[in-house]
Design a protein with these regions (language model features):
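Subset-of-secretome marker
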Residues: 2-6, 25-299
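C-terminal motif of bacterial Sec signal peptides marking the signal peptidase cleavage site
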Residues: 20-23
Length: 299
């Protein structure tokens, strides 16, 4: 495989997988460009109180099963399923199925079947690229990516995703809503047959101040830093909460520095066991090592 093609395949798999986990865990990857809802500008006090209680409870359960879809412009569209945990940094196992975009095409060029198994640990992530890709890199099918390498691999998009992944929990989506000056209860709806309350809000970076936010100064500063790093001007978030006080569904949409973004995530089985191990060393290769080995070859 040509070095340039290998780089596209490997980098695409890394960034898509990290985009997935950032979206699933509510890392603030989406930013909306739609105008503010009618009656926006004043947060509903009852909704703020309810969301503060929901965020506190969500922070105690520490794991969940997820199912979702993510789209980033013409770069990637995909589905993801698996489990994530956040008791000590973000960990989890997801299966990613690519349904379109340039990343999907790059994976096909590398002999992939459109699916990648991913394992997330505190400082690194592993992707099972399949037998066809493994045959081009010495037979090892698991590729390791260190989060600190993402900026080098993916430029601005990688830098943003590194920060999001290492700071993401399902609480982040709730924090975004609490930062919105227009957060409100948007009605009662069923989520896959389960009664839920929907909360909606739009976070405008230019208007994030302590005066119209339910976050403290430290939380607000951290959120502003994440949104600014991603090139976000406005982020639209909707969360559906079940009668047990835990999120059942989350949507984000809008624009980022990496392109138009939208995601939908369903949460279930809170408290499920999440056990993630590194793949066997004998079947693993570091992506940067692959690139170093190919650097002297054709490009």
């Amino acid at each position: 495989m040509r070095t340039s093609t290998l780089r596209r395949v490997g980098t695409g798999a890394a960034l898509a997988a990290l985009l997935s986990v950032a979206a699933c865990s509510g890392g603030g990857g989406g930013s909306g460009t739609a105008g503010k809802p009618t009656g926006a500008g004043v947060a509903d006090a009852g909704s703020v109180t309810a969301l503060q209680q929901i965020r506190k409870k969500t922070g105690t359960v520490r794991s969940a099963r997820i199912e979702g879809t993510t789209e980033m412009g013409d770069t990637v569209s995909m589905k993801q399923t698996g489990t994530i945990g956040w008791s000590d940094g973000l960990t989890g196992s997801l299966t990613l199925t690519y349904t379109g975009g340039t990343m999907a095409e790059a994976l096909k060029q590398g002999g992939g079947d459109g699916s990648v198994r991913a394992r997330y640990l505190q400082d690194e992530y592993y992707a099972d690229m399949g037998e066809a890709f493994a045959a081009t890199i010495g037979g090892k099918r698991w590729v390791r990516y260190a989060y600190q390498d993402l900026a080098e691999l993916g430029g601005p998009a990688g830098d943003v995703l590194e920060e999001q992944v290492q700071n993401s929990t399902p609480e982040q989506g709730l924090k975004a809503l609490l930062a919105a000056g227009d957060v409100r209860k948007a009605g009662q709806e069923d989520v896959r047959g389960v009664p839920a309350t929907r909360y909606s809000g739009t976070v405008d970076l230019a208007e994030l101040t302590g005066r119209n936010s339910a976050l403290d100064a430290g939380q607000l500063a951290a959120l502003k830093e994440r949104l600014s790093a991603a090139g976000v001007t406005r982020q639209t978030v909707d969360i559906w909460v079940g009668e047990d006080g835990l999120p059942l569904k989350k949507t984000e949409r809008g624009e980022t520095a990496a392109g138009t973004f939208s995601s939908t995530v369903f949460y279930s089985d809170y408290g499920t066991e999440v056990s993630v191990r590194r793949p066997p060393a004998a079947d693993t290769v570091d992506f940067k090592e692959i690139l170093r080995q190919r650097a002297a070859g054709p490009s």
